[in-house]
Amino acid sequence: MTTEEALQTIVRVVAPYVGETMARSAAQAHCQKLGVGTDIGRDQLDALISRLGSGLNIFLGREKSSRVVTELRAAMGFGSGA
């Protein structure tokens, strides 16, 4: 998957909770910290989702953040077992 495709999906899922600008800037910042290039691997994507989930805890609380992370994992094709 390209990083841009992943970012678009993240923004689509997370923006209703924190706004488009916050969703995009947080995802991009975490991509930089993880050393993500043009394409994002499954392990990097998993790490990115985990980091975003940790940040969402602050804004949404653990329960709602967990639901958003589950939704995000499903949107990225991780399925229910990931």
Language-model region placement:
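N-terminal acidic leader/helix
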Residues: 2-31
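Polar/charged alpha-helical tracts
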Residues: 5, 29-32, 47, 70, ...
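Short, charged early-sequence alpha-helical segments and their helix-coil boundaries
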Residues: 37-72
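Short leucine-rich amphipathic alpha-helices used at interfaces
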Residues: 1-2, 6-7, 36, 42-44
